[in-house]
């Protein structure tokens, strides 16, 4: 019951945002004049603050998580990507993690099968997450055509590649379908799985519903209730060049879409959606595993008085001689080294 209420609250929050955009923004123009700058200022400052906080956390130990053979004897095959021993390997590992979600691809889910513990891969989750993130990235890059004048050729080519199937008019974009299907799958998965539903918080549902609301409002503006693309570009260019303007013709769906995007920008630095920065800055990912070849001394350790072997041997020399044990200082005296 509690998990159902959390999902319902997330839906109600989305409806409230939509009503707020369609009602108040038409009268005051707050969504087009004030909110974009507030949202992007919060996003930039919030992300920089979170990264600064993470960067200040001390890492006293080298703690990379590995799943392959590290560099060792020459005749042992090693895994340079799974267990990197230098900075280049660690950078490649982080890059593949960010771009391909390799740890999620290897993720297994435990289950009880015929009274025994079994593990099954979660390839569907990996594919859904990968499709959602890549589709979202391509959509953001496509939207640069509204913020840049003239539009770069690579943005035009990216839009043409996205609509290469040429289905309908305007053509159906593959990333629109991929983003909608991936978000719907992630929502259904979180709702159908009893254990996952029990562990889900309001923030988990709200992030998915917010992204789904942005996707649906954008799809509706392209295929159902079309808006004036020229007016949209003028609006976005005005925001980017710090000359904001109010829409000449009412466009409630566009205002809802813009409000949801601004809400996402404000919400992102304070939510789990900041996991991209965490993946890059995580010491379990971005450190090389070379502790066997190189000693890493904690720079902020307090100086500790040491008692080396030479001092220990000098202290107990008489007892060692009585026990008949050889002394290194005697051997050094018999075999002096030439300078």
Language-model region placement:
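Long, highly hydrophobic alpha-helical transmembrane signal-anchor segments
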Residues: 5-66, 237-256
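Membrane-interface amphipathic/juxtamembrane segments adjacent to transmembrane helices
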Residues: 35-99, 290-294
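Membrane-proximal intrinsically disordered regions of secretory-pathway and membrane-system proteins
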Residues: 2-5, 11-15, 20-25, 38-45, ...
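Alpha-helical transmembrane segments of integral membrane proteins, especially early/N-terminal helices
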Residues: 2-12, 51, 83-96, 125-142
